[in-house]
């Protein structure tokens, strides 16, 4: 099985994005973040992405519909049904060809507490891979200033899953950042001023890092501008793809022609709206 055959199969099962990262390139990661802690025989990590329809953000962008479209087609159903089905189908396709693959959702576990190793030298449970590093290692994109993962195809509009496999294939080259360019449009777009580039840090795959602004998670949890807190199954993190910071990013990337997907009318068709921490309108 070649990487081209794998990618063609994934696309036939509905994947919009497919990348491959070798586990050897990820050997520098600590045990708690390393795919080999889950599957020591793995040779590659396959990253599968499905895009978030731009239309799923239309209601939030214009302040007309805040829950149904994005919550289902941009997040919950997209991850739990459409992306899961694509990943499952690729998994079964690989096993039918004699290769094992471990399927994993790409959940954000930033800041979550870890357990205690069962013995010295073992990773602290639970091992949950940093999907942004995996996706960048697989050549799919970069982490932007706002902390969201950006691809050349869709900007921040995608969801990811992963397969750890013992199949030996040609891996993709890591993605060198060029999309965000620290344009900074996300920073003033946040009515709560939750992003602080001056206190930011470098993040990403080793040698391909980019600046990520410090973020006040407590403010994000109280955001009334398209963000919402996920359930415990997703570690109660803040989902921000529809938030003001992300929508400003989508508009900025489109305006300078940085995203490959072209849609007839621009994403931003009117002045952005915003609400402060108590829900009052802001200019």
Whereabouts are the PLM-identified features?
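Long, internal scaffold/assembly segments composed of regular secondary structure
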Residues: 277-282
